[in-house]
């Protein structure tokens, strides 16, 4: 395991942006597999591989770039590594970024699932508030720790590891029709 971590660190040093995006996409996919297998109990025979591929593409092309970029912006908006700075970053993240990101994530998923604009709006109206409240149960303490203890170039990976559970929930929520 230590060798794997060292390899990951070396790749992060050489290609931080690519590695962050690949990590995010892969872990969004893992979240969908967990959602389908453990939450929805589909079984391997009924696993929707196309859905997993869609979720991974959202991770590669939306989650990874957007969250990775957001952390860079946030580090410029709120500087420092103190507890106070970590708290401020968490507040800006959870009040400013999370609501927008979550709405976009659910909307993108609905679009990729073939929902019409009207169906997507109805789904957002039905699911958004519940998902946002669930977000607030999980993410504030994770983000305070992330912003205080974790270097910028590892934040997306740390969040995505925790997010395997979150992604499982989001995949279930986003794909529940």
Curated annotation (Swiss-Prot):
Q: In which tissues is it expressed?
A: Widely expressed.
Q: Which Pfam families does the entry link to?
A: Mpv17_PMP22
Q: Name where it's found.
A: Mitochondrion inner membrane
A Gene Ontology biological process term: regulation of skeletal muscle fiber development
User: For the site Determines ion selectivity, which positions are given?
Assistant: 93
**Sorted alphabetically, which keywords does the UniProt record give?**
Membrane, Mitochondrion, Mitochondrion inner membrane, Transmembrane, Transmembrane helix
Task: Tell me, in one coarse class, where this protein mainly resides.
Answer: mitochondrion
Membrane topology per the entry is: Multi-pass membrane protein
Q: Which residues cross the membrane?
A: 19-39, 55-75, 95-115, 132-152
Q: Which InterPro entries match?
A: Mpv17_PMP22 (IPR007248)
**GO molecular function terms listed in the Swiss-Prot or TrEMBL record:** channel activity
- According to the record, the signal peptide region is none
**Role, per record:** Involved in mitochondrial homeostasis, and control of oxidative phosphorylation and mitochondrial DNA (mtDNA) maintenance. Non-selective channel that modulates the membrane potential under normal conditions and oxidative stress.
The record's annotation in PANTHER family points to:
PEROXISOMAL MEMBRANE PROTEIN 2, PXMP2 MPV17, PROTEIN MPV17
Q: Which disease is it linked to?
A: Genetic defects resulting in MPV17 loss are responsible for the transparent (tra) mutant phenotype. 'tra' fishes display pigmentation abnormalities and lack of cells derived from the neural crest, such as iridophores and, at later stages of development, melanophores. MPV17-null larvae show disruption of mitochondrial ultrastructure in liver cells with mitochondrial ballooning and disappearance of cristae, and impaired oxidative phosphorylation, insufficient pyrimidine synthesis, and mtDNA depletion.
The similarity annotation says: Belongs to the peroxisomal membrane protein PXMP2/4 family.
This chain belongs to which protein, by name? Answer: Mitochondrial inner membrane protein Mpv17
Question: What species is given as this protein's source?
Answer: Danio rerio (Zebrafish)
């Amino acid at each position: 395991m230590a060798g794997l971590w060292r390899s990951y660190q070396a790749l992060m040093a050489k290609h931080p942006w690519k590695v962050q995006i690949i990590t995010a996409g892969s872990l969004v996919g893992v979240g969908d597999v967990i959602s389908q297998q453990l939450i929805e109990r589909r079984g391997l025979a009924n696993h929707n591989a196309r859905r997993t591929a869609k979720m991974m593409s959202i991770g590669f092309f939306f989650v990874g770039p957007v969250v990775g970029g957001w952390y860079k912006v946030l580090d410029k908006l709120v500087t420092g590594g103190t507890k106070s700075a970590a708290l401020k970053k968490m507040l800006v993240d959870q009040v400013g970024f999370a609501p927008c990101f979550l709405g976009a994530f659910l909307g993108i998923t609905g679009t990729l699932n073939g929902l019409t604009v009207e169906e997507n709006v109805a789904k957002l109206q039905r699911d958004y508030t519940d998902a946002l409240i669930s977000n607030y149960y999980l993410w504030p303490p994770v983000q305070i720790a992330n912003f205080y203890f974790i270097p910028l170039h590892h934040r997306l990976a740390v969040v995505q590891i925790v997010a395997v559970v979150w992604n499982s929930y989001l995949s279930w929520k986003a794909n529940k029709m």
